[in-house]
Amino acid sequence: MSVGRDSLERIRDDVVVCRLCPRLVEWRERVAREKVARFANQEYWGRPVPGWGDPDAAIVILGLAPAADGGNRTGRIFTGDRSGDFLFASLHRTGFANQPTSVSLDDGLRLRDVYIAAVNRCAPPANKPTPEERDRCLPYLVREIAVLRDLRVIVALGAFAWDGALRALAALGHVVKPRPRFGHLAEASVGPFTVLGCFHPSQQNTFTGKLTTQMLDAVFDRARELAGR
């Protein structure tokens, strides 16, 4: 496909029908059938979860993969889970979201200057995609980066996302040596882009204080500075 004719809509259409990874297809569909008790009466999405947000975004927020009972249930990344609760509250405080919660596709949430995606678009068992599954999914991120013409900053939520961002940028011809190491508020200049590290807003990090609200807000304030917005 020619990148010049590509669009976020076309990428989304390709993502939601993807069945390239048999293990992930089996897992996401089994979770959607069996369901956890608290969501037993809800219809699960059970498909790959596309990126979403402002098509004129200067900032991409990049996660690992949808949560099995979060994005895999609701059809939107970081929607309907504790990580999303923490993330969107911060995006609202820092002026990137019109509301502090993200619970469903039709909840009225809108993003400003931000686009959210994940390295892997399907929920993986134990939140651990294999290297092969990562590599099969990475072209979707490469296409999104190419289409987002105003993009300047990629906020990588965790080391897996940091690695995925660097791999995607390398596929577009932007290679940095030696390879930058992940850290909270670490910055890597990669061609015309900056990759900005942030601890993932997982319960493991937020409940233990490894990532606080102030720390996450500081990341998005810095992303705005780097993007020149």
Residue ranges and their predicted role:
Residues 3-229:
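A polyanion-binding, active-site-adjacent surface
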